[in-house]
Amino acid sequence: MAKIIDGKAIAAKIRGEITAEVAKLASKGVTPGLAVVLVGEDPASKVYVSMKEKACKDVGIFSDEYKLPVDTSEADLLLLIHKLNSDPKIHGILIQLPLPKQIDTEKVLEAISPEKDADGFHPYNVGRLVIGKPLFQPCTPYGVMVMLKEAGVELAGKEVVVVGRSNIVGKPVAFMCLQQNATVTLCHSKTRDLAAKVGMADVVIAAVGQPEMIKGAWIKEGAVVIDVGVNRVGEKKLVGDVEFDAAAERASAITPVPGGVGPMTITMLLYNTLEAAKRR
């Protein structure tokens, strides 16, 4: 039976370290500040924003929330970002996605100052990530890499298979693994014989957003499985992208859903905000 990689425990440890660092900065008169911008009334987005606010409060980071109506124009949102870019109290800016259809998401993300890009989505930061000199790393992939390190998983020389090619998780985590000298295969909806690709992996990172799409029988004996997916099945049940019980029979280590990668995402957002404040 696989060892469970406990995201809650790892996140709690890192948040403890962040709290100490924030206190150290505060003693020098600097309080890290995060601006969170929510446009509209999307229920999931509202939950995420309140979780981020609470997390900031818990570690001593100042958070400023901007709730804008769903019919906010792109020009008005860009004006707010411009204001936040020049606000010395704000070290990190987070735009809660998705944005309403009248707003060009790429244009908005590009308007954020790269030095305040706490989510790590600005093209400048993506480019730096690709060449191995990141300023900020996207929070979920960063969380995955920290979990692998904390679990004692050495990536150099290993076969890593990433399933899912999103700009938010799949692509950045593939580049991060490459920087750790892994041999990386990036799979997606057009990949032929996905089962065979997954079956050769020493480490599987699933980030496709399809409930239990990765079958336990595909997992190589002794592989490490990181499940980024969070999918609601029915009213209450949450499952990942991997068939957990069957995969846990074959893997050496696996992340659960919930309680795996999820807690790490907000933790790395806090870390990025702290780092931004340190650089000022």
From Swiss-Prot:
Its EC number is 1.5.1.5, 3.5.4.9. This is Bifunctional protein FolD. Catalyzes the oxidation of 5,10-methylenetetrahydrofolate to 5,10-methenyltetrahydrofolate and then the hydrolysis of 5,10-methenyltetrahydrofolate to 10-formyltetrahydrofolate. Pathway: One-carbon metabolism; tetrahydrofolate interconversion. NCBIfam families: PRK10792.1 (NF008058), PRK14186.1 (NF010783), PRK14188.1 (NF010785). Homodimer. GO terms for biological process: L-histidine biosynthetic process; methionine biosynthetic process; purine nucleotide biosynthetic process; tetrahydrofolate interconversion. GO terms for molecular function: methenyltetrahydrofolate cyclohydrolase activity; methylenetetrahydrofolate dehydrogenase (NADP+) activity. NADP(+) binds at residues 164-166, 189, 230. GO terms for cellular component: cytosol. HAMAP family: THF_DHG_CYH. Belongs to the tetrahydrofolate dehydrogenase/cyclohydrolase family. It comes from Geotalea uraniireducens (strain Rf4). PANTHER family: C-1-TETRAHYDROFOLATE SYNTHASE, CYTOPLASMIC (PTHR48099:SF5), C-1-TETRAHYDROFOLATE SYNTHASE, CYTOPLASMIC-RELATED (PTHR48099). Keywords: Amino-acid biosynthesis, Histidine biosynthesis, Hydrolase, Methionine biosynthesis, Multifunctional enzyme, NADP, One-carbon metabolism, Oxidoreductase, Purine biosynthesis. InterPro entries: Aminoacid_DH-like_N_sf, NAD(P)-bd_dom_sf, THF_DH/CycHdrlase, THF_DH/CycHdrlase_cat_dom, THF_DH/CycHdrlase_CS, THF_DH/CycHdrlase_NAD-bd_dom.
